[in-house]
Amino acid sequence: KDEPIFKIITMNPDFNKRKQIKAEVLDKVNFDVNATFSSDRYTEFNLKGVDKGQATLELGRHLGIKADEIMALGDNNNDVAMLKSVGLPVVVSNASASAKANAKYIAKGNYETGVAEAINKFVLGE
């Protein structure tokens, strides 16, 4: 089909292989691409400007919510653009170092418990 490709994900548990794949793809494509690693096995390739941050801001615009009024929760490198784009970036306790570096709040819990903690604290005020 004549449909544009927006995202490609490769999976390999070996970080050195993932770095090699990233380097080879970025060397061979003739357009701007963002590449991120996530979940200790994925290499994600998106067109520049196609990321969770842009999607979050677009949804906010659609709903009439300003970026500084948005809370985003993340845990991995592919969440960094989203975390950078919002007013309250939150990560769970087992988040990657780069995600944590872009957070204003690090939840004490992992995954679901961390998300519940953030919602209780910042949305419900408990």
Task: State each model region's role.
Residues 1-73:
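Conserved acidic, metal-coordinating active-site core of Asp-based
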